[in-house]
Amino acid sequence: MNTQLLKRLYSIYSPSGKERKMVKFLCSYIRQLPGDISVSKDKFGNLYVVKGEAETYPCLVSHIDQVSHCNHSKDFKALETREIIFGYSPKNRRFENLGADDKNGVFICLECLKKYDAVKVVFFREEETGCKGSSEAVMSFFDDVRFVIQPDRKGDSDLITSIGYSDLCSEKFIEALEPEKWGYMEENGLMTDILTLKEKGLGVSCINVSCGYYNPHTDEEITVKKDLMKSLLFVEHIIEECTDVYPHTQSDPYFSPYEFEDEIYDMLNYDPTLTPEDLYEMYSTDFPHLRLDDYERICRDYRMLWKEYDEYKLINGNGYENEKVLS
């Protein structure tokens, strides 16, 4: 695995709205790759890359912005052990965010651009602030693609085939992927660029794939190298084996603004002291459709439920004392 390239990507700090250094690096790096490659930019600053000539192309997308709680220190380093990579500032003696979400996806895109003769890639800006980049995508770029892969999921085994109540791909495409053979299982995911593309009318199958990062959006974010390599090999398998076009249109797209409240309730169970402002800061990138007043309502409902439950326990003990034992 090209860890030198990976750590170079981690070293470029690119918070949402400030991706200029990353764009400059990508343009420079891509133009020195072998083959017939063109790079263009839309009005929003998204990068579109075409390599080779073909009737249809495999297509990969990733986003180039990151979320972190502190800026990179001047001495930021991506440190590597046998198993993992993590961000660290020796001077400040603190862990710092890698940006592996989604620079691991960027890495996979670059490796595939280098390896294959015909491929399309898009690098989106500002995914973390509500998929702003992909909402400005030039959709004609996707007219001749067979499918779209986004490596932008934590862990090592998730194959995102739906988001909310919106399916992203066809059953035929899922069968062609052979996910179980490669250690992946279908899951429902969070809002990301491929959902935005589908909502803009993209008519081919899309998936989001785990790519080996953990603890995203925190300063303790890590990459497990073998899990990233597993993702790269899976993506290469798809490119090489899925040579048909896999059409898919959303039958009844629906995205509930309250669908992921259970996850927020779980976080409140873990730390009941969290405020609506804390939750908004933590989840604004995962659930950009939720506003601050939504978090205020969720906190209010949560605390009311637990207050009622505590009062019930005071009156009724553990809740089982007055029940008859049936034999």
Positions of predicted regions on the chain:
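Active-site metal-coordination/substrate-binding segment of hydrolases
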Residues: 50, 54-118, 128
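Acidic/histidine-rich catalytic neighborhood of metal-dependent amide-processing enzymes
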Residues: 94-172, 182, 186, 193-194
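Short glycine/proline-enriched coil/turn segments at helix->beta-strand junctions
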Residues: 31-36, 52-57, 112-120, 143-145, ...
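Zn-dependent metallopeptidase/amidohydrolase metal-coordination segment
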Residues: 185-231
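A non-catalytic alpha/beta surface segment that caps or lines the substrate-entry region
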Residues: 5-56
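Acidic, low-complexity, intrinsically disordered interaction modules
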Residues: 274-302, 308-309
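Short secondary-structure junctions
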Residues: 32-41, 78-80, 84, 180-186
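His/Asp/Glu-rich mid-to-C-terminal helical/loop segments that flank catalytic regions of hydrolases
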Residues: 215-278, 315, 319, 324-327
